[in-house]
């Protein structure tokens, strides 16, 4: 397995993977999310590749206060092999190298499948309520 930075030629394969991993929501246009990321620090957008195929992704960010991880997903046939752990570990190292003191991951409360993994990796529940506001309306995906 190789972990590397996203490249333009990964575009369609990544969107297909996100569909397979059930990461897409009607209010988020994945093509626009990728385009925006490519225009704003693509070096934190990582893919895991096995035999030339993209089997995992994580899209990271850093705002000077904390890091974040989005679109963490691994192809169902490749789960349980440590790929998500490796992606997060690489992202964390990149964030630490930038002086980032902490990372945040938003997970639906009922997603028990991944909550255990995050806890094993040292992530803790934060007693906060996450609020959001759409600033630019995308076309429904």
Swiss-Prot record:
What is this enzyme's class at the first EC digit? Answer: transferase
Query: Has keyword Acyltransferase?
Result: yes
- Enzyme Commission number, as recorded: 2.3.1.-
Q: Which domain of life is it from?
A: Bacteria
The molecular function GO annotations come to:
acyltransferase activity, transferring groups other than amino-acyl groups
UniProt keywords (A-Z) are: Acyltransferase, Transferase
Question: Which PROSITE patterns does the annotation name?
Answer: GNAT (PS51186)
Please report the stretch or stretches of sequence annotated as the N-acetyltransferase domain: 1-141
Query: A Pfam family this protein belongs to?
Result: Acetyltransf_1
Q: Give the family, as the similarity comment puts it.
A: Belongs to the acetyltransferase family. YpeA subfamily.
Note the PANTHER family from the entry: AMINOALKYLPHOSPHONATE N-ACETYLTRANSFERASE-RELATED-RELATED
Name of the protein this chain belongs to: Acetyltransferase YpeA
Q: Which gene produces this protein?
A: ypeA
């Amino acid at each position: 397995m190789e972990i590397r930075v996203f490249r333009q030629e990964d575009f369609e394969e990544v969107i297909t993977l996100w569909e397979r991993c059930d990461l897409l929501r009607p209010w988020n246009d994945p093509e626009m999310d990728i385009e925006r990321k490519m225009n704003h620090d693509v070096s934190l957008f990582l893919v895991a590749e096995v035999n030339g195929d993209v089997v995992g992704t994580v899209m990271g960010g850093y705002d000077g206060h904390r890091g974040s991880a989005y679109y963490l997903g691994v192809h169902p046939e490749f789960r349980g092999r440590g790929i998500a752990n490796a992606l997060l570990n690489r992202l964390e190292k990149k964030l630490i190298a930038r002086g980032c003191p902490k990372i945040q991951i938003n997970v639906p409360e009922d997603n028990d499948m991944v909550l255990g993994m995050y806890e094993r990796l040292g992530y803790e529940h934060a007693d906060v309520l996450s609020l959001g506001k759409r600033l630019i309306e995308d076309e429904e995906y």
